[in-house]
């Protein structure tokens, strides 16, 4: 058994592992899992020229390294694979000689157990809300801003808005926002005479939509911009004939929960623990 860094040439074997195996953890992300090939740390266990397990958690942005994937072949123990690959990842990070947070959202029980055994600490929970699409006529107006469609040229500024609007570990890199924009069904910005002050990116599948990202510059918060972006999205969902709109937020983000409650979103009862591991050189 060999534990080593993944190489671009591993793509076919990794694709098979992700497709055929059931013990697979995927981070909630816009970027395809195999796009992380070539980034570090991304470790694999290889035996007899076959990849038995993989663990990837490159830093992006630099302050946070989300666990992007953990996949295990049915022929080996998830606990053993995790132990070997997590040791490999820790060694990779220790060589960088800088502090970093490693984050993971526990989407299933078996993965949550592995995190807790490795001294990850629960910091928060992600909760899910839903709005059942109804015919509505929102008054969408702002005395100092307008809402328009997001363009590719907006992405650098949108990334700056995101970085200022969210604390670590919730910030997104420009590359992640670009990937989100490419997959978006509906993406808009709120623009004042000072420039872009807020944005939203949403995806759609079949008859459902998901508000994947909503951000407003701190100096412009509590001025109706976030509500206007969501209202415009609700109108668009109705126009498209969609049946539901979901959104995730943190359990302790009271301002966000209050906003969605005012706009007739309701908690679904789904909750996913957020775990962090502090790497201090």
Question: Which residues does each PLM region occupy?
Answer:
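Conserved acetyl-CoA-binding loop-helix of GNAT-fold acetyltransferases
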Residues: 78-91, 216, 222-235, 239, ...
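Acyl-donor-binding surface of acyltransferase catalytic domains
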Residues: 73-143, 273-276
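Conserved active-site alpha-helix within GNAT-family acetyltransferase domains
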Residues: 106-124, 223, 227, 251-269
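Active-site rim helix/loop that mediates acceptor-substrate recognition in acyltransferases
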Residues: 18-47, 56, 165-197, 201
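A short beta-loop-alpha structural element at the N-terminal edge
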Residues: 1-14, 145-158, 268
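Conserved donor-binding loop and adjoining core beta-sheet/short helix segment
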Residues: 19, 29-87, 91-93, 200-212, ...
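C-terminal "cap" of GNAT-fold acetyltransferases
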Residues: 127-145, 151, 248-254, 266, ...
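Conserved hydrophobic beta-strand within the GNAT/NAT acetyltransferase core sheet
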Residues: 100-105, 211, 245-249
């Amino acid at each position: 058994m060999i534990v080593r860094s993944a190489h671009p040439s591993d793509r076919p074997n990794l694709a098979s592992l992700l497709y055929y195996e059931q013990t697979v953890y995927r981070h909630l992300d816009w970027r395809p899992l195999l796009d992380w090939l070539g980034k570090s740390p991304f470790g694999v266990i290889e035996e007899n020229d076959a990849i038995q397990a993989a663990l990837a958690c490159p830093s992006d942005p630099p302050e946070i390294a989300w666990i992007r994937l953990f996949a295990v072949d049915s022929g080996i123990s998830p606990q053993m694979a995790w132990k070997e690959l997590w040791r490999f990842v820790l060694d990779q990070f220790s060589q960088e000689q800088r502090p970093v947070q490693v984050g993971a959202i526990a989407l299933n029980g078996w993965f949550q157990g592995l995190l807790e055994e490795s001294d990850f600490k629960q910091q928060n929970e992600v909760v899910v809300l839903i709005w059942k699409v109804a015919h509505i006529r929102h008054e969408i107006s702002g005395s100092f801003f307008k809402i328009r469609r997001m363009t590719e040229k907006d992405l650098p500024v949108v990334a700056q808005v995101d970085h200022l609007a969210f604390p670590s570990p919730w910030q997104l890199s420009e590359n992640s926002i670009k990937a989100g924009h490419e997959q978006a069904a509906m993406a808009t910005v709120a623009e004042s005479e000072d420039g872009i002050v807020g944005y939203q990116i949403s995806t759609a599948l079949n008859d459902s939509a998901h508000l994947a990202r909503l951000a407003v510059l701190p100096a412009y918060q509590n001025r109706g911009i976030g509500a206007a972006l969501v209202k415009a999205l609700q109108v668009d969902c109705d126009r498209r004939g969609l049946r539901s709109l979901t959104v995730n937020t943190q359990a302790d983000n009271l301002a966000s929960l209050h906003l969605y409650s005012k706009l007739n979103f309701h908690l679904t009862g789904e909750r996913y623990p957020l775990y962090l591991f502090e790497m201090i050189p």
